[in-house]
A protein has these predicted regions:
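Internal intein/HINT superfamily modules and their associated LAGLIDADG
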Residues: 2-5, 16, 24-29, 35-249
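N-terminal positioning helix adjacent to the helix-turn-helix/winged-helix DNA-binding module
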Residues: 7-11
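Primarily a LysM-type cell-wall glycan-binding module
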Residues: 19
Length: 249
């Protein structure tokens, strides 16, 4: 039987810093060690007590999580009842992923070391992912219906949802945004469209043979771009990609 490799001291220190803030399984995969080695590090350093902090959400952090549940994020249970939030993006949206993570760090919802590469051994699936600390503060989000989440989105949340799950249709010079909503029910899709149109003054409507996506007009590009300028640096990869025609002078 092959002897398991010893943990590098630098890796052990990183595990100590993150122990109790996310699942031991995540730490094992992240640092390429066994699950028992992670637990050994915790036991040797008196870290057996789990840390489940209470979060003080800023509105920006709330909107990142709410929109992410509909978009590229997910809530995962850690233990019997508490949750952590994680989100994954392709490397072409690395700066966007980092921007979101940094907003959560400001509220002590995550820490810098909880951002890591994913599938780096597969050139066709390179991605970047972050996760938050585990907390009972995320339980209410896990219990929300999609309709309740949609109702709580503000202009930032609506923009982030569009950036996560939307794309530019090139049927005109400026193009227009299309939001992928086929996973929503008819009621949820109608609620999303009404939320955009009522709160932002956009002209969203169902498209497609089965009316499962939501399209906006080219004029709505200016509305979304102006919101993006308020919150996200223009040089960020997601802004450069989704608002390319708006940035050309």
């Amino acid at each position: 039987m092959a002897r398991r490799k010893d943990i590098d001291k630098d890796i052990e220190q990183k595990i100590i810093q993150e122990y109790g803030k996310c699942k031991a399984k995540i730490l094992a995969e992240k640092y390429d060690v066994t699950l028992s080695q992670v637990y050994d590090v915790g036991k040797r350093n008196g870290l057996t007590k789990k840390c489940n902090p209470i979060f003080n959400f800023s509105e920006t952090s709330r909107q990142i999580i709410l929109s992410g549940i509909l978009g590229d994020g997910r809530l995962k249970k850690n233990g019997k009842k508490n949750y952590y939030y994680s989100e994954c993006h392709a490397l072409g949206e690395k700066e966007y992923c980092i921007w979101k993570h940094e907003q959560l760090i400001k509220d002590d919802i995550s820490v810098p070391t909880m951002l890591y590469g994913k599938n780096l051994n597969n050139e066709h699936n390179d991605a970047i992912e972050f996760c938050t600390r585990t907390s009972p503060s995320l339980i209410p989000y896990a219990n929300m219906s999609k309709l309740e989440i949609i109702e709580q989105l503000n202009e930032l949340g609506l923009l982030l949802y569009l950036l996560d799950d939307g794309w530019i249709s090139k049927h005109s010079k400026l193009g227009n945004f299309v939001l992928c909503t086929y996973l929503l029910t008819v009621e949820e899709r109608l609620a999303v469209t009404n939320k955009y149109n009522t709160l932002l003054g956009t002209h969203g409507h169902d498209i497609g043979h089965k009316r499962v996506d939501t399209a906006f007009s080219s004029d709505d590009n200016f509305i979304f771009f102006n919101i993006a300028k308020e919150y996200i640096p223009l040089e960020t990869d997601i802004v450069q990609k989704k608002f390319e025609t708006m940035l050309i002078k």
